[in-house]
């Protein structure tokens, strides 16, 4: 698996067959083909440092790598000069080349490539990317050295509605809206009492949306295999390249990758990728699901012999403070026409970036075809720095694939060294110590952003939970974006990774939910790794394909402690038992290291508590029924249990603490959310429900949040002092600096206060925001659950608070002002600079 932090970086190869690709590829592809840019010289990458005290040969702009043991790595071969970027075929704006980011193990990042200067039919000026600086976290290399991975988020065109012929390359799209992804078009509204999504979907729109992107591929890449990878498209997506259909993916919560090699053109020819997303069959969800290409997109160019999709698995079968064994399996495929003798090398780097001795898997012949060949090796680690909640130490594995002595592909896999067990005596133990899950269950949308959540916003949300004492998240009721798990790894948060909200039976009248696809046969090309033959008897189903996808993608994250096969599944016990048996077997085959549970609702009526379901599951999971849970875990053979969903009643926590086998609980919910509106219009979210979040949608703690903060032993925070007479608008930014990267965002908070600065929580006055400088207001919110647009620059205060969410459009000073009738206005400034956002490590504010 390739870490999502790597996928955000522009990388180039030191090998001849991709020489110069960074200059042309980034200029042509990153600029969205709206520009003509000068290609950078493609120099050889530095050799891998593998000698004690002697680093690898220094690559361009890079520092000498730290030495491990073995022989000094050779210098990468010099590449040829990259040719100039070609003119844009559609005249869309050229965008900035992404900044290079340093390898945190000690190698400086590549320079961002030059953006274009002008599109051939009117594209605006692009900006040169900045030089990479320090890495974002020790021990996590930020860039592949051979495989080319290009961020593909910019330069898209969007049309809301159906568009006949939009799958064809020659389709006229010049009037379409230009934007970048991630993009959630549903959150843009409007709210509508008669929306087909109903109150369960937050009364927001659904339907069909089309995305198109024009790009060119340099001739230097014509010997590679070219893939397009989506982290998530909501929903029922169809992807086309130059008019050829690549595949369909119904489930909007999973990533997928298509091979475009046979259908792309190299050189100056225009390529067009088209994506149709369709959630028009409604209702389709019990909660807000969003719409569109709402997660990141990446374009990958790899040698014909390369590591297969998400094929690297890292586990730690032994892990103590004295020593650990890192066990690695990876699958190499051969897209060529002749068998190749392949060797695989693994280099582990510790959290400080120091490389350990390299380990080699025995050479094997890899035949052409998709089946691939499995390589395994073990890496011994003395005195490892264990991954734990308070010390989230991250190691990394660099896997090099070599043919005839030359490295043709590589893969960087972050991982943590830890031991984790669940049993009926001690519950959950992490590194030999009993740990209780102080958990919350949440949905993936955040405030005015919907489901297209910038990485900074996820970082902010997880930091807010940590302040309340939370140490675990249940991803309700679907897998989250890759960067969410990256942050959980870095911040020491445990994750219960949930698959589905439904199986074969719809919930309520939600005719468009996943039950419509669950048991259907998946096509031969799904965009995911093949389902193991032992599980898929004949054609694989969509549920088998999606679980394979999720587990293979997520299994290397130390934060992921367990999988949940579903939430409150309505299938009858006979159907459910057979399916559950297959699901657990599939999870164990793909990831033997992790346990499997399910969030069961009222299971006592059908015999599950002491019957088949309890026996099949590794860990008993129960929603809202403590007695059933206690019965299930105490019935022989005993097993661990977890309260997968509970309300805010604090009495349950004393039961958790007094029951060793009970691993912990997850409160519903961690934060208010859109959809599942319990009351009538115009309430559009959960906030009026007695089971509201520990915080509102914008992160303001609700009263119960402070209660659980104290119960969980977190340092106390005090609610703001309150006043009675509104006098002024006080404006504050959660961060004084902002990067020109759409993964970064600043929350500008407007507080209605009295003359002494005390918050007037009774105020619901409209707040008007204005902005000057290189910034834009991407949304407004207050935490209110009433139907009120998230777009524009006006928001009614809720509990005396309103927010403007701001992103930078260029470097410089951004000034935001807020005004309200009869009150003194406020001003806040944010300094924006060019750069690439990097995920935090450890305690993040």
PLM-predicted stretches and their roles:
Residues 137-229, 285-293, 716:
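Extended carbohydrate-recognition surfaces in non-catalytic/accessory domains of CAZymes
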Residues 221-224, 264-270, 339, 381-396, ...:
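Short glycine/proline/serine/threonine-rich loop/turn segments at secondary-structure transition edges
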Residues 46, 53-57, 295, 374, ...:
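The feature marks long extracellular or luminal low-complexity segments
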Residues 148-166, 180-181, 186-187, 282-283, ...:
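Substrate-binding clefts and catalytic carboxylate motifs of secreted carbohydrate-active enzymes
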Residues 162, 201, 206-310, 335, ...:
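Accessory beta-strand-rich segments of carbohydrate-active enzymes
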Residues 241, 323-365, 373-375, 748-749, ...:
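Beta-strand-rich binding/interaction modules
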Residues 3-6, 17, 29-139:
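Ser/Thr-rich, Pro/Gly/Ala-heavy low-complexity intrinsically disordered linkers and tails
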Residues 250-262, 266, 283, 382, ...:
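Active-site mouth of glycoside hydrolases
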């Amino acid at each position: 698996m390739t870490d999502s932090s790597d996928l955000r970086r522009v990388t180039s190869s030191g090998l001849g067959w991709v020489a110069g690709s960074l200059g042309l590829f980034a200029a042509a592809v990153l600029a969205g083909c709206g520009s003509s840019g000068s290609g950078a010289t493609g120099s050889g990458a530095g050799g891998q440092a593998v000698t004690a005290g002697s680093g690898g040969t220094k690559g361009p702009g890079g520092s000498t790598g730290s030495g491990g043991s073995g022989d000094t790595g050779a210098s990468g071969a010099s590449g040829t000069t990259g040719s100039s970027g070609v003119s844009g075929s559609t005249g869309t704006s050229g965008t900035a080349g992404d900044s290079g980011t340093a390898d945190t193990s000690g190698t400086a990042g590549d320079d961002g490539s030059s953006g274009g200067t002008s599109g051939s039919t009117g594209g605006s000026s692009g900006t040169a990317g900045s030089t990479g600086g320090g890495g974002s976290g020790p021990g996590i290399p930020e860039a592949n050295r051979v495989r080319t991975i290009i961020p593909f988020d910019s330069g898209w065109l969007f049309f809301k509605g159906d568009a006949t012929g939009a799958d064809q390359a020659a389709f006229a799209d010049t009037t379409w809206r230009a934007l970048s992804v991630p993009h959630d078009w549903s959150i843009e509204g409007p709210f509508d009492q008669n929306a087909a999504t109903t109150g369960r979907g937050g009364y927001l729109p659904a339907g069909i949306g089309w995305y198109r992107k024009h790009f060119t591929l340099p001739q230097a890449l014509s010997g590679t295999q070219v893939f397009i990878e989506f982290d998530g498209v909501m929903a029922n997506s169809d992807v086309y390249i130059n008019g050829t259909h690549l595949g369909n993916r119904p489930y909007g919560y999973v990533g997928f990758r298509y091979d475009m090699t046979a259908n792309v053109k190299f050189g100056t020819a225009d390529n067009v990728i088209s994506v149709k997303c369709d959630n028009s069959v409604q209702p389709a969800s019990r909660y807000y699901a969003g719409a569109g290409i709402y997660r990141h997109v990446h374009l990958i160019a790899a040698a014909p012999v390369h590591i297969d999709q998400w094929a690297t698995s890292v586990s730690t079968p032994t892990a103590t403070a004295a020593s650990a064994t890192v066990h690695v399996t990876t699958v190499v495929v051969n897209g060529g026409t002749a068998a190749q003798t392949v060797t695989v090398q693994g280099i582990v780097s510790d959290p400080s970036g120091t490389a350990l001795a390299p380990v080699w898997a025995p050479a094997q012949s890899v035949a052409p075809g998709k089946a691939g060949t499995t390589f395994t090796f073990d890496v011994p680690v003395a005195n490892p720095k264990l991954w734990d909640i308070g010390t989230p130490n991250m190691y990394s594995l660099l896997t090099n694939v070599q043919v005839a002595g030359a490295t043709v592909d590589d893969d960087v896999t972050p991982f943590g060294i830890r031991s984790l067990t669940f049993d009926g005596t001690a519950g959950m133990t992490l590194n030999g110590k009993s740990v209780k899950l102080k958990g919350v269950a949440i949905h993936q949308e955040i405030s005015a952003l919907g489901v297209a959540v910038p990485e900074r916003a996820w970082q902010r949300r997880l930091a807010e939970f940590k302040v309340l004492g939370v140490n675990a998240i249940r991803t309700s009721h679907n897998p989250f974006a890759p960067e969410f798990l990256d942050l959980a790894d870095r911040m020491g948060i445990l994750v219960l990774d949930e698959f589905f909200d439904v199986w074969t039976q719809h919930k309520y009248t939600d005719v468009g939910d996943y039950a419509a696809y669950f048991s259907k046969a998946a096509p031969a090309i799904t965009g995911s790794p093949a389902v193991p033959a032992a599980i898929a008897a004949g054609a694989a189903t969509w549920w088998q394909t999606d679980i394979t996808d999720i587990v293979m993608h997520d299994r290397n994250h130390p934060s992921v402690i367990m999988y949940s096969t579903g939430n409150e599944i309505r299938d009858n016990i006979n159907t459910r038992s057979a399916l559950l048996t297959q699901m657990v077997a599939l999870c164990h085959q793909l990831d033997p290291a992790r346990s499997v549970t399910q969030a069961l609702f009222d299971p006592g009526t059908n015999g599950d508590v002491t019957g088949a379901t309890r026996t099949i599951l590794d860990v008993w999971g129960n929603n809202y029924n403590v007695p059933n849970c206690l019965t299930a875990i105490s019935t022989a053979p005993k097993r661990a249990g977890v309260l997968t969903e509970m309300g805010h009643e604090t009495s349950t926590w004393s039961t958790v603490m007094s029951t060793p086998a009970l691993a912990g609980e997850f409160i519903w919910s961690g934060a208010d959310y859109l959809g599942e509106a319990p009351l009538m219009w115009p309430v559009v979210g959960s906030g009026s429900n007695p089971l509201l979040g520990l915080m509102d949608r914008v992160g303001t703690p609700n009263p119960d949040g402070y209660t659980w903060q104290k119960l969980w032993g977190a340092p106390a925070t005090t609610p703001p002092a309150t006043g009675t007479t509104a006098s002024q608008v006080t404006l504050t930014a959660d961060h004084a600096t902002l990067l020109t990267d759409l993964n970064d965002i600043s929350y500008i908070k407007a507080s209605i206060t009295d003359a002494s600065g005390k918050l007037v929580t009774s105020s619901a006055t409209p707040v008007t925001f204005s902005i000057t400088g290189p910034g834009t207001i991407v949304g407004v919110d207050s935490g209110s659950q009433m139907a009120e647009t998230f777009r524009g620059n006006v928001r009614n205060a809720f509990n005396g608070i309103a927010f403007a969410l701001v992103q930078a459009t260029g470097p410089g000073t951004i000034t935001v002002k807020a005004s309200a009738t009869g009150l003194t206005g406020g001003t806040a400034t944010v300094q924006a600079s060019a750069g690439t956002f990097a995920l935090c490590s450890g305690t993040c504010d």
